[in-house]
Structures are given as structure tokens and as C-alpha cells.
Amino acid sequence: MQPNSILAKAVRFALISGAATAALSASAVYAADEDSVERIQVTGSRIIREGAVAPTPVTVISGEELLATGATNIGEALNQLPALGNTYSLANSGRSIGTAGLNVLDLRNMGTARTLVLVDGKRHVSSSAGSQRVDVNTIPSTWVERVEVITGGASAIYGADAVTGVVNFILKEDVEGLDFSVTKGFADDSSHSKEKLSLSYGTDFDNGNGNVAFAIEYAGQDRLRSLDRDQTAISFTELRNQNQQPGSVDPNDPDKILTPNAGYYAINNAGVFNLDGWKTFNPDGSIRDVYTGSNVDGVKCADCDSFNLRQFSDLQPEFERYNINFKSNYQLNEDMQAYFEAKYVNSQSTDYGQPAFFFGSPVTVKRDNAFLHSSLQDLMDEKGKDSIGVRLFTNGLGQRIEDDTRETQRYVLGLKGYIGEDWEYDTYAIYGQTDLERVNKNNMIKKNFANAVDSIMVNGVAVCRDLEAREAGCVPINIFGEGNVTTDARDYINTVSTGTSVIKQTVLGGTITNSMLYELPAGDIGFSSGVEYRKEESRQNEPDNAEGTFFNVLGEDSGEYDVKEVFAEVNIPLLADLPAIQQLDLELAARYADYSTIGDATTWKAGLSWQLNDELRARSTYSRAIRAPNIGELYGALGQNFFNVDDSCKLDNLNDLTPEQAAVRKANCAALGVPSDFNSDYDSASIEGLSGGNDQLKEETSTSYTIGAIYQPDFIYGLSISADYWNIEIDDAISSVSAQNMIDKCLDSSTIDNIYCKRITRDPNSGEITSIVSQSLNIAKLEAAGVDLDIGYVFDLYNGDVNTNLVLTHLLKRNEYPFQGETDTYNEYAGYVGEAEWQANLTAQYSKDNWGVYWRTRFIDEVSLYTPQELEKNPNPSNNTSYGKYFISDASVSYSFENGIKLKFGVDNLFDRDLPYGTTGTGAGSASYDNVGRYYHATFSFMM
């Protein structure tokens, strides 16, 4: 390429900014060329300021650092940063329907919808229906130059959704040469393995005026089941402390004891029923008493006939991904360059769930059932029963399986260049589309199952009782015992249902920038402005038979919106070359947006950068950001869901309250028809209900500010220290009132005539909750604050280079107010599982001649499994109230041959650090902990 002088400066700036090989300081990077050494700042701004700095805190991760461990997907590496939560990592992506295989980012654990993900500062199509959540695994890791993680509201500069911050992937502009790499890894104590293969090639053409490149990437991993590892194969359950002193509130005398080899005895694969005591079926269908042992709590027990639910759970999903990327640019003349990018990504993930089950609503079995063993018939006759209710997992019908296939394509076409000596422009058009196919296998047709279970004997042959069903092909099923389900019965009851989603994004935009707009005594004014039009579309289709199957019905929904935006940013040098004020700059930014859904919205930002001397700089920002409701929140149809609740009308729960609160709740429970002695055995039961969108939603608004400093002492060359305090507050946060909150709000009101009670349905006879309806509302408030510390030190050692870096986050506050008007009612999550008060990554690299050594240690502070509010209500809920301090280390060594070949061998989780006691590492919070164990990996790469 043949850039003019201004372009050369910009390219030089970009190259140096991404030159370091570790997670770099949020403040500065030392970079060297043959003639001089200078400090370079990554700005988190659209204004290029070579040799200057900006007030926004930015953490930079180089592309090489992303590939340093055995991670085969970008998301795996990024989710280990202290600033990011593990809300949707690959390990826990299957916990929601339709999300298996996704890896989306969540800055500050304030919601994936509030983190804006960009590629080269531009929007990227979503991978999740109804949202703007970007699957970062679709980004080609081979071409990543660096990743900028920007803290705080950045809507004024980058647009809506940047409420908690921005993650901006900067790709290599010109790709030259061949880069081939293959990685293979396997776990130490299981058959789990991963692999990755990438090939990239780029070349200049037309005497350097153009560049063309392509990249192909494959990544895959095996399924890892809980039963595949000794530590996670054991079932843990909290049981009542039988030795607790009456009325004890002593944490050393807890209510519950986390107990291994424990679980429910009232359900299993063979079938369980309660008739003059709990009984289960032998494999042949005969019956026996359930052995509950001596440690019993409701329908749970230990060292007994408990059922291990972990036989159905996975630690890692089966996953494959194929990426094809193409890019090209051509210098049309000295001041104009055309560029084009295209990508296609196909990812496939398989999530294994529990079989269809019947617990709260048992299967009704009649006395004359064709498969009923004579021993049970005799017992029913003795007790005068015509039918019984059987609780079971229908394991004979197979585990429910969800195969998710995503196809993502994205195209970018643009012109950029220079007008005169000082003005730089970039105009672009983007189209992106994601197609999702969700195939649900072993999906029970509930009506067919009911017909098949209700069988009778006719002329010595088992047939379905219902004549119409029999004529339609009904095949009777024997659910008693194990191994008795025929293939014909399975085929009649199960179906394969397929749901599809299509997400589309269209963007037209342009920016114009002048880093030297006007010269002031203190320096040049920098200016950037732009316009953008964006259209988002999403459509989700359910299969025709979804309504009558066991899989959750998500509901069909579709919607679209567009937004027109104009924005501007200016950097004004105020003072320079004064005592204690080497440079003082003011940054201002504003954006006006017109949405087809919510109407007008304005965001802004102000920042101050104060360079005291060559060694010390202070910085601060204050901003207002918004997040417009996404398509799913606006137009999501009411779909089937399941809510985990503990009914507040239970006598045990009422007895834990103050007399005044108990009196109000008892009166409302009675008014709802709940018996006064109601005390369901099913604590934390899963209640069926509906959840969906609300087209009356408005935008969320946030205010955030940061205050920080950067210190680069002259007396320790290569050392850079930055510390930033950040504070984020979100009002009118879009939230569905939790099912538990809805129950409590219903019962704590003066009467049952309120919006919460109207959304809850109870059985008129038993008083049990049978259904809950939840919709999104602008009802919540979120706030978080913390301190980020970033220390980088580069130095020489024994004729080699050492690059060390410490990235640390101290979380001071993370509060959620379910109802923003009730400021005294909130949950504190700082220090809660997944949101440790202290988190840190320490990396060190040593390179000498052709050798390279890498080390990383991650630290997660002790976390609580209960919020302070929960412990205030009950200070001794369990003997397992926290996970201890967690250290995990990775190491690798590499050797580069003169012919371009490089070999690398590494071990992740070098010391085989176990998971915290009782967890599987697949929850939204516990996914921070490694569930694979010690993992060996090797990489062969070749560059020329």
C-alpha cells in the first residue's frame, strides 16, 4: 500500500497500539522503533490522537494473548477477564432454550444486552433471536489485532446498548503471507478433547495498491458429561440439619447440610408412588418399598434410594464451528480506498437435557392398566384405590436433545480516505444475517403419552384404552420399571420438532474526522462526526406441533425497528506547558437518535484528561447512555417457561416472618383459597407458566462516571500503573418481575386485588400454584461500582524479554432493585457467586532467541452463595454458604524454528484445581470455575 503521511501516522498508531503480547495496560503501552521510544495510548474514541491520551479507561488484549492458552474460541479467553461475567460461556450456554453454543459477553455482570460488541468500531449482527447479543466465537481469531474493552457508558460515541461498556474487536487491516495453525488438546481425567485448525493467506497486488486475504477456521470439542468426572458424578443435596438446636440462628448450627450421595427419593427412572408409604418399581415391574434411610428431609434423603440428577447433566456441550472470511481493499487513488469484507460462520451445538418428567403432576395409572404388576393390583385392591399417581423420569424415551445450528453471514462495503491534508472519512454499508435452526429430539407428544400410558388388556393383548387413539395408531407403553419401553412406543410418543429464527441487520453510515481541526495555544482541536441508519429485524417460528409437546413453547414472535442517528465528538486542549499542567484536554461527545419504537433519545459524554508531567496523568469521564428495548422485549410472544419458586403461603415460610408480616400474608393466602395448614413437600418447585414481551416498554437510561490515574515512572523504565474508579447506575431497567417476587408482592399487598395476584393461578382445591405469567417492564434499577487496577512491566532478563501484567478488579458495589421506587428493597451481589469482590489475572511471558514461556494465574476471591439480604432473613441457611478463594494457573512453552514453524505445548489448570464443593461449573455464576480439569494442548503453526 502507498499511504500519504497522515495515513502513515494512523497505521503506525494502530500497529504500535496492538504490538504488545499480553493483556496490556488500560493506560499506555511502551513501544519501540529503531530511532525512538514513545508512549502510545489506545483512546476508546473515534478521534485519532497520536502522542495524546484520552480520558476513557480502556483495557487492551492483543490477538496473541487470546491464543496463548488452550482456548479454541475467543469467548473462552475473554470471559476470563475480571471485568467480564460468565453469563453465557460455552460451558453454560445450554441452560436456556435456543442458546446452546453461544458465547456472549457481559461487562460488569449487568446483563449481556447492555454490552455493545463491535468489529472495527462497526455493528455486528446478533446471533440470538430478538436481541443484539453477538456470538464472539463468530469473529476470526487469526485476524484479531487486539480487543479494546471500554468501561462505562459509551452510547454517545458508539451508539445504544453501550450502557456498561463496549468490546471492540480490531482486525488486521492488511494480511500478508501464509499462516497455518492446528491445535489439539485433551483432558487429563476424561475423554474430553478439543481441536482447532486455521488457515490464513493474504497478499498485495497491483504494485501494492491492493490487498486480498481469506481465512478458514474450524473449532470443535467433545461432549463432557458430569458422570465422566469423579468430582462431578456425585449428587449433592441440601438436607435438613437433624441435630439443629430449636430456634438456632448460629451459622455453625445451620438449617441445612450439603450432603453428598443425596437427592430426591420421590422420583426416579423406574417410577415412584405413595400408597401406604413410598414405593418404587423393580426392573420387571414388581414393587418394593423405597429405602429412605435415616437422613430424610421431605422427599429427599441421603445414602438411600435417592436419584442422581447429574446423570442427565453435561459439563461441556458437543460443539463444532466453521468460519470462512474474506477481505480486500484497494487504493483507488492517493486519497481514497475501497474495502470489502465477507464472512460465513456455521456453528453446531448439541445440548442434552433431562428426559420428560412427571413430579408435581404425577402420571395417573388406573387399576386395570395392561402392564400393572399383580403385586401392585393387590395393594390397590387392599387400599380401595382405582388409580395411583406415578412420578418418574421417562428415561426409556430418551434424554431430550436440542441441536442448534447457526449460520451467520456478514458483508461490509466501504470507502474511506482523506479530503485535503486533515480530513479523514469512512462511509460504509453493512448487511448481516443469522439463521438458527433448533431441532428438538425425543420431544414427547403429551397427548400421545397419556393415551399410551392408559392401556388395557383386550384378548390378552395390551392396547390403548381410547378407541379413537387406538385407531390412529396408538402404541401402549410400559412405564413400570426399567428397560420395558419398546421402540414402537417410543416412536409413537416422541417426535422431532424444529423451530427456526432469522435475524437481520442493515447499517448505512459514515464518519468524518479531523485530528487537527483548529490550532489552539494548548494544541490542536480534534473533531469527529457521523451519521448512521440501522435496521434490526428478528423472526422466530415455532414448529406446528410445539404446543402439545414437552419442550418449552417459546412462542412465535417477529418484529423490527429502525433508528437514525447523528453524533459528534470533540477534543479541546485547554492548557499546556504550565507548572503541574503539561496538558489538559476536554473531551465532549453527543448523539441524537430517532427510533421507530421509542422515539427520540439523546446521549452525551464529557471527559477530562490532565497530564501533570511525563510520569503522571489523571483522567475522568461522565456520561449518559441508553439502551432501547430489543425486539424480544418488545414483541416477544407469551411462551412457555418454568419458574423455580418457594411458595410463600407454606406454613414453614409463614412461621419465619415477623408477626405483622405473617398476619398480612396469612389473610391474603386465605383469600386466595390456600388451606391454613398448607405446607407443600415440594420446596423450590418448578412451576409452569408464561413469559413474554411488552410493546409499551421505553428505553433504559444510565449515568456513569470514571476517575483514574496513570503512573509511568521514569526511574523504572517499562513500568506502567493505572487505577480507575468506575460507577454505573441504570434506571428504568427492563426486567421481568421474578416469579418469587411476584408471589411475595401479591401476598404483601393490603388485598389480593393487585397486578401480581392476577398473574398467579392456584389449584382451587389444594392451593398449589399451577401457573405464573411474567412480562417485561421498565421497573428495576441497577448499580455497580468498582476499581480496576492495571500494572504492566516490561524488562530485560538474561538477554531475553519479560512482559508481565496484572489486571485486577475490586468490585465495591453491585446492587439490583427489583422495584426502582423501593430504594430500601434491593439485593447486594458484590461478593456473590460469579461476582467476587476481588478478581485478578497475572500473566508473565519470557522470550529469548527462539524460545518463549508463558504463565497465567487467575484469582477469584471467596464468594457467598447467599446475598446479605438473604442472610439477614436467615443467618444460618446451610453449612455450604460460600466458595473459597480460587487460584488456577496455565502454562505453555514454545519454540520457533528459522523456517517459520512454531511448536507450542501447554497445560491449562496446571495444578488440576478442583471445582468448589458441590458445583458443576455450569451455572451463570459458577461457570467462572474450570470444570474440565487439567488439560494438555499442543499447537503446530507455520508462517511464511
Residue spans of the language-model regions?
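N-terminal Sec signal peptide and the immediately downstream disordered periplasmic leader
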Residues: M1-P82, S198, G202-D204, N241, ...
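Short loop/turn motifs that connect adjacent beta-strands in outer-membrane beta-barrel proteins
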Residues: D33-D35, E50, D174-G177, S190, ...
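Extracytoplasmic beta-strand/coil segments of soluble accessory domains associated
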Residues: E50, L78-R123
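N-terminal periplasmic accessory domains that precede
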Residues: I74-A77, N103-D106, D135-N137, D161-V182, ...
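Short acidic/polar hinge/loop motifs at secondary-structure boundaries
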Residues: K122-T151
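Surface-exposed, low-complexity loop segments enriched in small/polar and acidic residues
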Residues: L224, D230-L239, T280-R321, N325, ...
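C-terminal beta-signal and terminal closure region of outer-membrane beta-barrel proteins
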Residues: V439, K447, S623, G636, ...
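C-terminal beta-signal and adjacent terminal beta-strands/loops
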Residues: I445-K447, L812-N815, T857-E870, S894-M944
